[in-house]
């Protein structure tokens, strides 16, 4: 089961009136924590039982753990509060670093703040 997380400066992610944009992240591109990259195309390839399908998520940031090179975790923007999914909450650390760089916090769907 995957958990949804949001990167926000607001007290509540679902009431964020001024969400972080990918352009803000781009301004700090040289400072991004290791493993993060900006992907302006945002086209994902997903393996299914029927072959490989593509999905366009628009410009995004992805994290690739050096110990898990076949797996990317995408932070989606799409005009909303940046969000990403993780199956294992113990893997939040790089996203907490990204949030700190943006003077923000990570919140789950229930509003619990992670630091």
Roles of regions detected by a PLM:
Residues 1-115:
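Acidic (Asp/Glu-rich) sequence patches and key acidic residues
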């Amino acid at each position: 089961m995957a958990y949804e997380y949001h990167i926000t400066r607001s007290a509540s992610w679902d009431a964020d009136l001024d969400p972080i944009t990918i352009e803000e992240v781009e301004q700090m591109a040289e400072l991004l924590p290791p493993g993060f990259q900006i992907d302006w195309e945002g086209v994902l390839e997903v393996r299914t039982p029927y072959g490989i399908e593509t999905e366009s998520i628009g410009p995004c940031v992805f994290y690739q753990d050096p110990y898990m090179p076949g797996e990317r975790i995408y932070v989606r923007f799409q005009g909303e509060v940046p969000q990403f999914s993780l199956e294992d909450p113990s893997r939040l650390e790089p996203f907490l670093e990204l949030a700190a760089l943006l003077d923000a916090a990570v919140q789950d769907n229930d509003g619990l703040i992670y630091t």
